[in-house]
Amino acid sequence: CNAIENCSKPVFALINGTALGGGFELALSAHFRVATASAKIGLPEIHLGLLPGSGGTQRLPRIIGADKALKMMLNGQPVSAGEGLASGVIDRVEESGELISASMDFMLETTAGKHPRIPTRERTEGLQDEAANHVSIGEHRNTWQKKGKGLYSPFQIIDCVEKALSTPFEEGLKYERESFARCLESPQRKGLIHAFFAERRCSCLL
């Protein structure tokens, strides 16, 4: 992801279908994201007792702020391309389905200087309202303290997003890696993984 983000040429992520977890985290490292109208994006790692990796907890808040980023990560459900466009994480939605053609048009606009190439780690739109971000962190933490007893990853996700808002990118990325490792070792993660595969096996029998 860092290699993509650091590329000196504009990098476009074209999203057709569903980009969840690692696929969306990869798209976040691109400089621009173009999606079809039917596309879905999301970060469902919480359902497995994990947190978004590859810089997902650090890049998304820099674009859309703490509240929207936390809702996506803590809910774990896919959102539509239209919702992504409204939040700012998707740069363009192609209604006709001609994704490559639309992306080429966007690329030409970029080379003409209409859309500056800014690495996601350097984006600051989501960091501007410090007070709102601080309030959002507190509200989400309080909510999960009430309903998330016995769970581990929601609080790690909140802590990672808080780091994204208050520390340099590399420091936040290091914290994310350490938090991911802690989640991997948690009994909650092991239980949720077991439940996930048990549910899939049961569905095959129906």
Please provide the spans of the model-predicted regions.
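Residue-level "edge-of-site" marker
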Residues: G17, K40, Q58, L85, ...
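Amphipathic alpha-helical segments at domain termini/boundaries
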Residues: E25-S29, K71-S179, F197-L206
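Glycine-rich beta-to-alpha active-site loop
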Residues: A3-L48, P52
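An acidic, glycine-rich surface segment that forms the CoA-thioester-binding/catalytic face
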Residues: C1-G17, G56-Q58, I63, R189-L206
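Active-site-adjacent scaffolding segments
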Residues: N2-K9, A37, H47-L48, T57-A81, ...
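Long, low-complexity segments enriched in small/aliphatic residues
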Residues: R177-C183, Q188
